[in-house]
């Protein structure tokens, strides 16, 4: 094709830039016509020497892209085929309640201007209502809507906000430091120096902002966290993140239930085991990589840095999109979610979910977090979901390829949320 081949790993991590470096002219033209809105919908490897992407341009044109991988793990050919139109993301998204608005807002936190969306009744005649801060997961890349670059717009925090509006609960969700309109702010020159303190500060500032709104009933405040956001929800509600208005209810939606680096280690070892079963790695190579991952975790916990020499690919385990900076990882790992949960004020109402289809962690691991909530004498509503993936969608498959599919949000979770709000907020 007249261009040097690009490693498959680079295509995966930096999809838009690396893909377009080798894309056919017709696809480049389509991308440019789409005002630069190239999105990765799914990625699969049907066999070890083939990577298949499905991508869209501006949500309209969809392409299936086959990228054969040579013996050195490099891509030297591209086959792209346009696909038929698919459903719009809006078709699976709960709608905002009539008479409610989603208002863009800003607030300050730690010297950074945070951009967010305040969802509330459009008329002051509605009086005061309960209100909740919504915290997303996945480090610095997930924005106020629960979306990340290079992925299908899942909009899971939009779904939660719209569900809350239907139940008469206002909400504030925001672009965390490093994401969306907020960006890196004063950390732009050195994002790796941010650590977790800015994320704690913005959670506290968000709750204070919400409590100041004229339509907010300050006696009925809540915080909901998804995935890694669950840790910050616990830090906020317990007061460990900083002084903030008292929270009456906490929602932990498929939260990280154990120390974060333990979770990274477990998921990495599971991936290596699967690769051996599929014939992609030898048992000896997988064992060597597993030992390197264990060394890397020990180093992060001891020094906050990775060892100088690691096998190819292991460092990327801790630097990939959605993981946060190394400093943030090492700092958030200090918190055992169960230990933080045990510090919640007694009788705090807590909605906790786990699912048999969450392939990040199972209900047995979430039981560890539940034990901490029990120790705190929380009013715990522990809901075991059936066939719901990590991103709150109906999907029993545990297939990561489906994370970027347009699937409906969980009706079980919606029912559990409605019941919890009616009883506790």
Residue ranges, per PLM feature:
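N-terminal cap/lid segment of alpha/beta-hydrolase-fold proteins
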Residues: 85-127
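Short, surface-exposed "cap/lid" segments of acyl-processing enzymes
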Residues: 124-164
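Alpha/beta-hydrolase active-site loop
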Residues: 156, 192-213
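Primarily recognizes the serine-hydrolase "nucleophile elbow" in alpha/beta-hydrolase
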Residues: 205, 209-274
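Accessory cap/linker subdomain of secreted extracellular hydrolases
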Residues: 251-343
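Short beta-strand/loop motif that positions the catalytic acidic residue
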Residues: 344, 351-354
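Conserved alpha/beta-hydrolase "acid-adjacent" motif
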Residues: 359-365
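Catalytic active-site module of serine/aspartate enzymes centered on a nucleophile-bearing elbow/loop
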Residues: 388-392, 396-425
């Amino acid at each position: 094709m007249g261009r040097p081949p690009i490693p498959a790993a680079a295509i995966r991590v930096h999809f838009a830039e690396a893909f377009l470096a080798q894309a056919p002219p017709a696809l480049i033209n389509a991308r440019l016509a789409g005002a630069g809105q190239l999105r990765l919908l799914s990625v699969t490897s049907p066999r070890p020497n083939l990577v298949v992407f499905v991508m869209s341009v501006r949500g309209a044109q969809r392409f299936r892209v086959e990228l054969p991988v040579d013996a050195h793990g490099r891509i030297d050919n591209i086959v792209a085929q346009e696909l038929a139109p698919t459903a719009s993301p809006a078709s699976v998204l709960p709608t905002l309640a009539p008479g409610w608005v989603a208002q863009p807002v800003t607030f300050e936190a730690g010297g950074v201007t945070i951009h967010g969306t305040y969802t509330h009744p459009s008329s002051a005649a509605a009086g005061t209502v309960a209100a909740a801060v919504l915290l997303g997961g996945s480090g610095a890349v997930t924005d106020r809507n629960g979306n990340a670059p290079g992925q299908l717009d899942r909009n899971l925090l939009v779904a939660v906000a719209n569900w809350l509006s239907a139940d008469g609960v206002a909400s504030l969700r925001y672009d965390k430091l490093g994401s969306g309109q907020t960006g890196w702010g004063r950390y732009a020159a050195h994002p790796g120096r941010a650590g977790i303190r800015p994320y704690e500060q913005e959670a506290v500032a968000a709750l204070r902002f919400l409590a100041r709104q004229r339509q907010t009933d300050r006696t009925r405040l809540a915080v909901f966290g998804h995935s890694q956001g669950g840790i910050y929800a616990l830090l906020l509600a317990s007061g460990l993140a900083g002084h903030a208005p008292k929270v009456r209810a906490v929602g932990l939606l498929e939260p990280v239930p154990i120390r974060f680096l333990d979770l990274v280690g477990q998921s990495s070892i599971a991936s290596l085991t699967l690769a051996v079963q599929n014939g992609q790695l030898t048992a000896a190579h997988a064992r060597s990589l597993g030992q390197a991952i264990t060394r890397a975790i020990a180093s992060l916990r001891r020094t906050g840095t990775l060892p100088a020499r690691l096998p190819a690919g292991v460092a990327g385990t801790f630097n990939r999109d959605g993981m946060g900076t190394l400093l943030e990882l090492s700092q958030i790992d200090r918190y055992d979610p169960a230990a933080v949960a045990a510090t919640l004020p007694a009788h705090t109402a807590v909605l906790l979910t786990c699912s048999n289809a969450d392939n990040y962690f199972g209900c047995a691991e979430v039981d560890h977090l539940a034990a901490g909530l029990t120790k705190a004498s929380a009013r715990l509503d522990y809901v075991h979901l059936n066939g719901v993936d990590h991103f709150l969608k109906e999907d029993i498959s545990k297939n990561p390829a489906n994370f970027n599919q347009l699937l409906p949000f969980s009706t079980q979770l919606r029912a559990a949320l409605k019941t919890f709000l009616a009883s506790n907020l």
